[in-house]
Amino acid sequence: MKHDPISKTDTVGDFIAHYLAEIGVSVMFGVISIHNMPILDAVARQGRIRFVPARGEAGAMNMADAYARVSGGLGVCLTSTGTAAGNAAGAQAEALTAGSRVLHITTQVDLGYADRDRAAIHDVPRQPEMLRGVSKSVHRMWDSNGAIGALTAAVSDALSAPSGPVSLEIPVDVQRAPAVVMAAVHAPVPTRPSAPQSAVEEMARLITQAKRPLIWLGGGARGAVEEATELMRRGVGVVTSTNGRGVVSEEEAANLGAFNMGPDAMELYGSCDLMLVVGSRLRGNETRNNKMPLPRPLLQIDADASQGGRNYPVDVFAHGDAADTLRRVLDLLPETLDTDEALAFDIARLKAQAEGRLRDTLGPYTVVAEAISGAVGAGGNAWVRDVTISNSTYGNRYVRLSDPRQGVHALGGGIGQGVAMGIGAALASHGPKAIALLGDGGTMLGLAEMITAVDEKAPLVYVLMNDQAYGVIENIQDAQYDSRRHYSKVAVPEFGAFCGSIGMPHVKVDRVDAFEAALQAALATEGPRVIEVDMCAIGPFAEAFAGPPAGAAGKKE
């Protein structure tokens, strides 16, 4: 039932709750506090938005981030001023890295004390400066007259390309102030840059001339599924970043997926005569620190003009929205390109080789990878991954995705975000259960949010890979530091006992042949479940993973 229009007796807090519901927000994540009570009291009274009380602000932000990625809409996180907003900062850095459509509504002390270092509690003298470091933009609601403008500006900025998390400060006395009466609320229309026609024409000309063209799809192409798939249908091969997975289904023969940096990818790149990069930063961890040779001419489409040629010199750059620019390129291309008929076959062959090479490194965990891939492929489950060896090996590449909204992972590389991200993804799925891959070390950071999953009856299966250590750190120490394993083996709880204490169903798997049955049983039941995989009992991977071949792990000479 819709709430009546804002009346003369309503407050700005009422208007905020009303506005969010009117533009389609149905779920909000956060932690209640003295400085955001006027908003949450209104949310509860109006009854139009489901509020998910996280156990910490970092968890709330991770939930909102994952919710945005899976739903394709706006994720909303509500925190309080000061320490609470700071608690969310690390998780918001992840949302910024991923370009997630998140609105972070935080608060401020009374307007007369804000920015003056005089408030009694929860005051941060330079809170906007802190927020700017992890936000696409920062806004403040100064009074009730400007409530509609502040909300519209913040929401529009979060949704507009290039998207990203936006912070909105609302002083508590402004929340309590009388609202301005408005007859209706109108949802903002996101803005998207339009590429110059001359760049579109030049790209179309070069693609038409190429015999073995490739398109590299990043996270900025997640809204261009139809256009990217059509380009593949006309004869262009596909490779993706980890954040661009599923833009073109990974079941397609002509899609190499995220096997983008191994010897098979290098062989493919060496045989191709054009690459079009769409919505990707070509980050160093996927391009061997930007030293991996890529096909030329190299074309780039990005909604962020500053990304043009940032990590690789390009021959043509189009500043524009991915879907719109690709559609305009397609309009200038023939229905079937005159490309090498063997290109799709070569990609399928090289992908099969890459998958086989990966399976050889997994040892007993091939069974786990196959079971999860089969479940995700058949059910279309959201596939959420924390930073763990299992994700760095098979999670990021081997488990095939057919839709970009299926994939959620910690793009910025910070551990411990998977527990909360699983909840946000699960509540956005509206279908099959989400599956979240965790490690025991990272789980320690987000453990409190497991009871949130129970409380919310989240449709979610946690697969907890427990090797009783920071496994990848130990492997790096073995490879780079003569096996000096300092500080990497930390105590973890008995997860079965912990789960029992919060009412979370739990099963421990100590034989890989029991994993698939445990997974299917967990997927068939309601609510959250934990499958703990005892890696100490099962044994090691066939080949130790000691970090990516580029990046901070370095290489011992």
Role assignments for model-derived ranges:
Residues 160, 377-378, 454-459:
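Basic phosphate/pyrophosphate-binding loop/patch that engages nucleotide-derived ligands
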Residues 134, 371-379, 499-504:
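A structural motif corresponding to the C-terminal end of an alpha-helix
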Residues 13-23, 31-34, 39-46, 347-419, ...:
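Active-site diphosphate/adenylate-binding microenvironment
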